[in-house]
A protein has these predicted regions:
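Alpha-helical membrane-anchoring segments
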Residues: 1-305
């Protein structure tokens, strides 16, 4: 059938260990987001209710006008729920709960005049992870359901880039590339490094054309061999590193969602910690590479008084 190659691509099986690692990372970030990146959402309810202009989904769904009590309940239940979900327990129940509450958290955050576009990939990941089923860290067994969850997250990440370029052309045309967008950003929130870069003639204009080019070409990451794909994803991360270093914009939720491209199953901090704390690593010197073959590693006799 004509749709089979697309279906196979969308549901390409991945190790369950990768899903477990991605799930833990995403839910831990949600908890960190509440207390580090978006604690200001709780102050939104201090303004008059008529300033609340919900986004389209907030208008279509029967979502109430936020109150201090409502936002407080969302904060604490979401914080506890995300930490529990990070353990991998009850992936569907906790996963859907975290998605629903974080979705409402974002509706409240973005319904007072400013809408960030760096959270699209994270929201898609939160919506997809409950469908991935159970997964344990280090499990090499492959899962198509988990592959689907990662793939749709990857698509959302790339759409963030491509649609950003589309928006630039839609509202600014080529004037976006030839204007003073980066210069204005540096004036508003630039670092010392940005001030040095801004002194190079025409460099900011070249950078603006480069940003447009990489955003428009970002979908090509899906047709590259795995080695080159990882290299391109590394370039994406380096771009955001430069962005943080020059105009202090982090895109942290987007960076977390972009780990869906990475072989996260290779990172197993819990297993590493267990190995370091195991008796073999703490006291079995006979297995240590620095122990010579003729070393006497037996216990020393007690001194006689």
């Amino acid at each position: 059938m004509a749709g089979q190659p697309v279906t196979r691509w969308l549901t390409e099986a991945v190790p369950r260990g990768r899903i477990a690692a991605f799930r833990t990372l995403v839910y831990l970030f949600v908890a960190a987001d509440l207390v580090v990146f978006t604690p200001w959402v709780r102050t939104r309810v201090d303004v008059p209710g008529d300033l609340y202009q919900p986004l389209l989904l907030g208008r279509l769904l029967p979502l109430p006008t936020p109150t201090p009590a409502l936002v407080g309940v969302i904060f604490w239940v979401l914080l506890v729920g995300s930490l529990l979900a990070a353990t991998g327990r009850a992936p569907r129940l906790l996963g859907w709960t975290v998605f629903a509450l974080y979705f409402e958290w974002m509706i409240v955050a973005m319904s007072y005049g400013k809408v960030d576009h760096d959270r699209f990939g994270l929201l898609v990941a939160l919506a997809a992870l409950p469908t991935a089923g159970r997964a344990r860290h280090g499990d090499p067994t492959r899962t198509q359901a988990g592959g689907w969850a990662l793939r749709v997250t990857q698509i959302a990440v790339i759409c963030t880039y491509f649609l950003a370029a589309w928006a630039k052309f839609r509202f600014g045309g080529l004037d976006w590339a030839t204007g003073s967008v980066l210069a204005r950003a540096i004036i508003r929130r630039g670092t010392d490094l940005a001030d040095l870069i801004a002194q190079v003639p025409h460099l900011l204009i070249v950078a603006q054309f480069g940003i447009l080019a990489f955003e428009l070409l970002s979908p090509l990451v899906f047709v590259l061999p795995e080695r080159w794909r990882l290299a391109v994803v590394g370039f994406f991360y380096s771009f955001h590193l430069v962005t943080i270093a020059t105009i202090t914009i982090s895109f942290a939720p987007h960076l977390v969602a972009m780990t869906s491209f990475l072989p996260l199953e290779r990172v197993r901090p819990v297993s590493l910690l267990r190995r370091r704390r195991s008796p073999a690593s703490l006291g079995q010197l006979g297995d240590h590479p620095l122990a010579a073959a003729d070393d006497d590693l037996s216990a020393a006799p007690l001194a006689q008084s």
